[in-house]
Regions:
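Short, well-ordered helical secondary-structure segments
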Residues: 15, 31, 100-103, 117, ...
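Structural signal for short hydrophobic segments within the conserved structured cores
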Residues: 1, 92, 158-160
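Short intrinsically disordered, low-complexity coil segments enriched in acidic
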Residues: 1-5, 168
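Short acidic alpha-helix that forms the nucleotide-activated donor recognition element
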Residues: 98-109, 125, 129
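Catalytic binding pocket for nucleotide-activated donors in carbohydrate/polymer assembly enzymes
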Residues: 111, 115-168
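Short hydrophobic-acidic sequence motifs that mark active-site Asp/Glu residues
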Residues: 2, 34, 112
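Conserved catalytic-core segment of nucleotide-activated headgroup transferases in glycan assembly
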Residues: 5-94, 98, 105-107
Length: 168
């Protein structure tokens, strides 16, 4: 099987929940821009986190919606937001839900912002399947090029950046 633009086939049988979800249901503001990153928290480095906090400062009222991992990472992330002069309440965590609901709730976000050293893999495919655009920064190694591969394969190369300045 030859895959010219990506190494990772995905299946088109994943169902999105038909349950009506609102931003309020997810603890998100109804009228704000929602940046989202559902990658595992251990993929977040200070490089992208600094950019994300600058984005929150630039986009009035916006929030960052992250995957809930454990209480320690949540506390540390909120503490780091505050250290960067961002109200920690603007960082919202998404708890675990069944896959169909997880896929559907991504439609409540406006933009998926990727991590750098270890891009979203399946997470990017899920976001794209849900209709959520993904912005990534391509790197040198395999793990830092996966989201770009997926974006190329769906015809969205303009969402692939080559440096932090363009990503921001």
């Amino acid at each position: 099987l030859y895959l010219p633009n990506t190494y990772m086939p995905t299946d088109n049988g994943r169902e999105l929940s038909e349950r009506h979800m609102t931003r309020r249901d997810m603890g998100l503001p109804e009228d704000a821009f929602v940046f989202c990153c559902f990658n595992n928290n251990y993929k977040i480095t200070s490089s992208e986190f600094d950019i994300w906090m600058r984005l929150l400062n630039k986009v009035e009222g916006s929030v960052l919606w992250l995957r809930q991992s454990n209480q320690w990472s949540e506390l540390n992330i909120k503490k780091e937001a505050q250290r960067r002069k961002v109200d920690p309440e603007r960082v919202v965590f998404a708890g675990s839900v069944p896959m169909a609901e997880h896929l559907a709730r991504q439609r409540l976000a406006d933009l998926f912002i990727d991590t750098f050293s270890f891009n979203a893999h399946t997470t990017a495919a899920e976001a794209l399947w849900s209709g959520l655009p993904v912005v990534t920064k391509t790197g040198q190694g395999f793990a830092a090029r996966v989201a770009g591969s997926l974006l190329n394969s769906v015809g969205l190369p303009e969402l692939i950046t080559k440096n932090e300045h363009d990503y921001e």
